[in-house]
Amino acid sequence: DGIFLLATFGFIKEYEFEYFNPYITKKQKGGIQFNFNLKDQNHLEYNTINHIPVFYKSKKSLDKTLSTHIEYSHRESFYNYHYFKLKYQNTKINDSTKILNENYINTKKNLNQFLTISYEFDRDFRDIKNYPLKGFRLNASIEKTGLGIFGDVNKLKARIYYSQYFKLKKKFYYSFNLYSYVSSNNQPYYLFEDENNVRGYQTYLIQGHSNAIYRNTFKKELFNRIWNLEKY
């Protein structure tokens, strides 16, 4: 079992609680995760101009979002995992946010809420997950936001990620990864994707409902030494 607690203060106040149990079945192949998150912002990115994010600061709350989800994970084998998630999210903004960007939540009222259901598959054959040098990983997911209960959002997203790692001669290593997603167009501003960082463009925000990113990496091992810390 594991419990995670978070509390941050400042322009963005955030409180989070998470409980995770990877083995809830007798065969130890099923796990459960529960998450609760509350975020309150009075310094808000509300739009972009020439692909540069624009912010607004206020003494009042501009965006208050409550989200909670439950996720079931199934370990098919040592390398294959399946994840099933159900999420609820509720976002409330004030009048200033709506004046700054009418499409921020894309509803006539100052409240937007929805349910999300998703499935994710992960196949991981990497030698070391934190710093892989050999092997490959395949991750794919499909997500439906808005199940027709509240009627505020209707979005479908599919995503795929693949990476492979090679050991070359003379202690050189090469790897590549491909990431791509496609999602529904004409969505509220705050639901645009924000999970892709392209080297050299970290200060820019290019909005879109689909993309593909391909990366290459070369590495050279300069030295390799193991220290025995037990004697200390």
Q: Language-model features: where?
A:
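Gram-negative/organellar outer-membrane beta-barrel architecture
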Residues: 1-118, 123-126, 192-196, 204-209
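C-terminal outer-membrane beta-barrel translocator/porin domains of Gram-negative envelope proteins
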Residues: 1, 107, 114-232
